[in-house]
Regions:
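N-terminal short leaders/motifs
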Residues: 1, 10-17
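Glycine-rich beta-strand-turn "strand-cap" elements at beta-sheet edges
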Residues: 1-4, 40-58, 81-110
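Short, well-ordered beta-strand segments in beta-rich or mixed alpha/beta enzyme
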Residues: 6-13, 45-77
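Non-catalytic surface loops within mature trypsin-like serine protease
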Residues: 16, 63-65, 102-104
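Short amphipathic alpha-helical segments
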Residues: 18-43, 76-77
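Generic "edge-of-domain/loop-turn" microfeature
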Residues: 19, 68, 105-107
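Short, solvent-exposed alpha-helical surface patches in well-structured domains
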Residues: 21, 68-71, 84
Length: 110
């Protein structure tokens, strides 16, 4: 495994009261679009905040390089099924935060 893996953490702050709608939208449209378009292989997982800041949907992606990451997002943003989903998701979000992280050269990796 490459010790220089790049992880991208995307945190979406969901409008209060809208999390059930966001989860349903991801389940019925977002995830199927990711799988059908062949985009799901980079996904480590989706998470919903339980303590600390609430109303957050967090997803983590793993890439071998920044070039691979940029190609992935470029391809995803050209996927019409995913973009139809994204257009419905955006009004339910308050803000988005993206953090890029490099894997440490020791310890377990997802």
């Amino acid at each position: 495994m490459n010790s220089l893996e790049l992880y991208e953490r995307r945190t979406y702050e969901v409008s209060v009261g809208q999390m059930p709608k966001v989860l349903e939208l991801y389940s019925s449209q977002g995830w199927p679009a990711l799988e059908a378009g062949g985009h799901s292989s980079f996904l480590v997982g989706y998470f919903v905040s339980d303590t600390g800041p609430l109303h957050q949907l967090i997803h983590i992606w793993r890439f071998t390089s920044d070039a691979e990451r940029r190609d992935f997002w470029s391809n995803l943003f050209e996927d019409s099924a995913f973009m139809t989903f994204a257009a419905q998701l955006r009004p339910l979000l308050q803000r988005q935060e993206i953090q890029l992280m490099r894997s440490a050269p020791w310890g377990p990796r997802p």
